């Protein structure tokens, strides 16, 4: 059978829009008149729907609708006599290839009588959604190496990473991809990539992949422009992985790529050494020393940002990398400034009187 032609897709688009889709999807009730007009047997129509509804949500997006229409036309025209057991490769949307692959793997396991009892797979249920700074740095390094010019990541762009995972079957890699990509787009952004890699990391270390994601992440992944905020994740009081296992994720992979697991922040080591480190007032948090500490951090960050800018002017070869480092420090500086301003407002509400530490600061 030939591939879908552009004129054919345009025709399906007109029909799809005529059904007045909601959230870019049409329900069975909306599609029912179109299906019944084909005068095909009810059993065949049901099989077409089952085959086309790839994500099993009871609705069809435009790609799934195109599959439905093409199968119906082929049945009517006699190009095929029966609904195929699975979609031909030429009819599979690239954005849903990973999902179909995962579904086929599960179905194959059922047909072979493979036991998927969670209690017997040797995995634990203590999956941890918290992403430590060290892990996040590793994930960001992989993202920087593999994203395209639009800042997006394709599923197959990480094939070389998948090959280094000894304990993660291909079907579970696809499942992890689908968790962070509920809209089945062909690519995912940085925020989704970080969580995707974290899921693979946890699974590689013996943690069972959850069946869903937290509500906050689910809402984030459903947006066109996610608002991923690591600070919103609550750090647990216990660690579920050893430090050695955390360091091991993607270490071989990054070594092959010549990065040896280093993050972008490793570039700042020469800039933040010596006298630029400042005094650590972390033990005094919650006292008036917190104000002194914040003011010192703001000053240090401003000085460090200035050095980064001067370095960028002198060395244009690392322009893209410098921009990323600069952006990350600008965001950190903004956060610290807001934290300091908020503390100042709270002090104004509480009123003055007391500590005498402002005299020390002066």
Swiss-Prot record:
Residues 339-350 have a biased composition (Basic and acidic residues). GO terms for biological process: actin filament organization; ascospore wall assembly; endocytosis; endosomal transport; reticulophagy. It is a peripheral membrane protein. Residues 287-348 form a coiled coil. One of its GO terms (cellular component) is actin cytoskeleton-regulatory complex. Component of the PAN1 actin cytoskeleton-regulatory complex. PANTHER family: EH DOMAIN. This is Actin cytoskeleton-regulatory complex protein END3. It comes from Lodderomyces elongisporus (strain ATCC 11503 / CBS 2605 / JCM 1781 / NBRC 1676 / NRRL YB-4239) (Yeast). The gene is END3.
